[in-house]
Design a protein with these regions (language model features):
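Catalytic center-proximal scaffold of phosphoryl-transfer enzymes
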Residues: 1-207
């Protein structure tokens, strides 16, 4: 998986791809069903592994990770402007407006800082898969924040123990923290419409 601030195209992929495939096959053997949507951080190995398992499942690239990657391609003096344009695009109110601002973003940043535009194009339509979902789900579907917050909270709770004797111990500790309420989870935004499948992709081609 991508480290924070690391460029997606700089990641080692093949060993990680095999590790992810092996882990996924274990979960499938335990009853994991084909997902309706894959939400990933942008790691090339992760994306390749999941695509080999579920080639027809829509994939959403985390918009927070992509924002960090855009900033890594821009001089610090432009960070505020990149962020403003990116947020205007990602948090637009309709699918059509998201796509309109995507085109404007690329036109502007191809001229102003080519690396920023190239980084956005690297993700392609996978950065905008959330627009195929009911709008009530957009907040949760845009990022991997929910999973990462849970992970960070778990690490914070066990930081004094540093090393656990086994994976089973880690799982037991996690569920005990969850059951006791020390770690809490909330329903994802738009949970009422989760049964609705993603719409077909009808995104305008970006000039």
């Amino acid at each position: 998986m991508a480290r924070e601030g690391q460029c997606e195209d700089a990641l080692p992929t093949m060993p990680l791809t095999h590790e992810i495939q092996d882990t996924a096959m274990i979960l499938i053997a335990r009853g994991l069903r084909t997902p309706d949507l894959l939400l990933i951080d942008g790691g090339a190995g992760l994306e390749r592994a999941l695509a080999s398992l579920w080639p027809n499942v829509p994939t959403q690239r985390c918009t927070v990770h992509k924002h960090r990657n855009l900033l890594a391609h821009a001089p610090e003096a432009l960070h505020e402007e990149v962020t403003a344009d990116y947020n205007d695009m990602i948090y637009a109110e309709t699918s059509a407006e998201v796509m309109r601002r995507r085109r404007l973003f690329l036109v502007k940043w191809r001229l102003k800082c080519r690396g920023v535009a190239d980084s956005l194009e690297e993700a392609g339509d996978r950065l905008f898969t959330f627009t195929r979902l009911p709008q009530s789900q957009w907040r949760s579907a845009r990022t991997t924040n929910a999973v990462e917050r849970l992970h960070e909270e778990f690490k914070r709770r066990i930081k004094t123990q540093t090393v656990l004797p086994s994976a089973e111990t880690a799982a037991m500790l996690f569920w005990s923290l969850l059951a006791s309420g020390q770690i809490s989870m909330r329903k994802v935004d738009g949970w009422q419409t989760l049964a609705e499948p993603p719409a077909s992709m009808h995104l305008d081609l970006v000039a």
